[in-house]
């Protein structure tokens, strides 16, 4: 997993995590499950670390449903699914840990419509958005995220 994050961060640094480079399609999707490429003609396997870490390029904008996962691509805005160690729950409690944009984060506040997280150990925020909310391994909604004054704001979408 550490190697995977290093490769991903390196990729972000070299491409700027944007759609400006000619060889970078609309979105980079990282999934924790195998995607049947034959079902999605616009999915191109970028690299595969193991059975749990796979990166895909999507050559068109749009949202794609695959089992419990929702994968979105919109001009460099990415959806991500996470490993089983830290995942969003249906209602993350203040003080609990979640995985956000591939990094461990602590929930610092929670309300009916949003919750805020702070990254642990000063790890960098990679700018990913459209994160899945999972409860016991099942995706129950999407979280859209943005940054205000250095804090990551997460809006719940059920």
Where are these regions (language model features)?
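Bacterial N-terminal signal peptides
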Residues: 3-12
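Catalytic histidine site
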Residues: 17-62, 134, 138-140, 144-158
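Active-site region of chymotrypsin-like
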Residues: 18-19, 76-84, 99-158
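Short amphipathic beta-strand and strand-loop transition segments with alternating hydrophobic
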Residues: 46-48, 67-73, 107
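Hydrophobic, well-structured mid-protein blocks that either form specific transmembrane helices
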Residues: 57, 63-74, 78-82
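Short coil-to-beta transition motif at edge beta-strands of beta-rich domains
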Residues: 91-99
């Amino acid at each position: 997993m550490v190697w995977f994050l290093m490769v991903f961060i390196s990729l972000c640094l070299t491409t700027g995590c944007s759609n400006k480079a000619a060889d970078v399609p609309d979105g980079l999707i990282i999934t924790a499950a195998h995607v049947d490429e034959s079902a999605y003609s616009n999915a191109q396997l970028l690299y595969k670390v193991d059975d749990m870490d796979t990166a895909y390029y999507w050559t068109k904008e749009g949202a794609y449903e695959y089992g419990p996962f929702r994968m979105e691509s919109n001009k460099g805005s990415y959806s991500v699914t996470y490993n089983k160690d830290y995942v969003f729950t249906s209602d993350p409690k203040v003080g609990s840990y979640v995985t956000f944009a591939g990094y461990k984060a602590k929930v610092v506040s929670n309300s009916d419509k949003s919750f805020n997280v702070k990254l642990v150990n000063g790890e960098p925020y990679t700018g990913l958005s459209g994160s899945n909310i999972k409860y016991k391994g099942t995706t129950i909604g999407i979280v859209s995220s943005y940054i205000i004054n250095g804090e990551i704001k997460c809006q719940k979408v059920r």
